[in-house]
From Swiss-Prot:
Keyword Secreted (UniProt): yes
Residue numbers bearing the Valine amide modification: V17
Species of origin: Uperoleia mjobergii
Cellular localisation: Secreted
GO cellular component: extracellular region
Keyword set, alphabetical order: Amidation, Amphibian defense peptide, Secreted
Main location as per UniProt: secreted
Tissue specificity remark: Expressed by the skin dorsal glands.
Protein name, per record: Uperin-3.4
Record GO biological process: defense response
Length: 17
């Protein structure tokens, strides 16, 4: 769902940082 997309985006950002 939308929450999954947001969590994936947050995880991607954390991986970049």
């Amino acid at each position: 769902g939308v929450g999954d997309l947001i969590r994936k985006a947050v995880a991607a950002i954390k991986n970049i940082v």
